[in-house]
Amino acid sequence: MNQSDFSSSSPYSTRLHGSSSTELVTQPLPPQTRIAFIQSSWHEDIVSRGRAAFLAEMSHHGVASDAIDLFQVPGAFEIPLHAKKLAQSGRYAAVVCCGLVVDGGIYRHDFVAGAVINGLMSVQLETGVPVFSAVLTPLHFHEHETHLLFFTEHFLVKGKEAAQACLQTLASLQKMQALLG
């Protein structure tokens, strides 16, 4: 498959199984579908833009705001444990995570970032619940106006992308479940 096989106006459209045409059908999420969104508190002014963009994109595609539960944790390091508990609860079809890990000069931020991403991957593989990461680790981050503006805008993009990935993955899993029985 190539990238054009997945493109359409709706982020959770999928190709008809067994169809040779390029016709796409939209698979809305079941009404009982719930999604958890976890956000870290560090750099909340920046990270909250990712949450806002995620919620706006989900709303744009018909997902009610009351179908998304919001959770806030102190830092990115706390995200994987919360993601695991939420995924294990059986209440959520997906868990979306948003945070910013920066080099504060005291510890190796790349170790923290690696632990977070590895933890999130483990959660989804162990539980079967998809976990999406908008946990970003910039190579260089300084709290001056240029970086603050750039990352504030970048989280808008990442929040929207997380919503689209979430919708596409849930639709794909729904389709796969129907095919596999």
How would you describe each model-predicted region?
Residues 36, 69, 78, 93-95, ...:
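Structural motif
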Residues 109-181:
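C-terminal binding/interaction regions
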Residues 41-42, 100-101, 136-140:
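Short, ordered loop/turn segments at secondary-structure junctions
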Residues 52, 77-84, 88, 160, ...:
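Amphipathic, non-transmembrane alpha-helical secondary structure
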Residues 1-31:
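N-terminal amphipathic/basic leader segments beginning at the initiator methionine
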Residues 25-73:
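Glycine-rich phosphate/diphosphate-binding loop of Rossmann-like nucleotide-binding domains
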Residues 71-89, 136-137, 141:
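Glycine-rich oxoanion-binding loops at beta->alpha junctions
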Residues 78, 82-120, 124:
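Glycine-rich phosphate-binding loop
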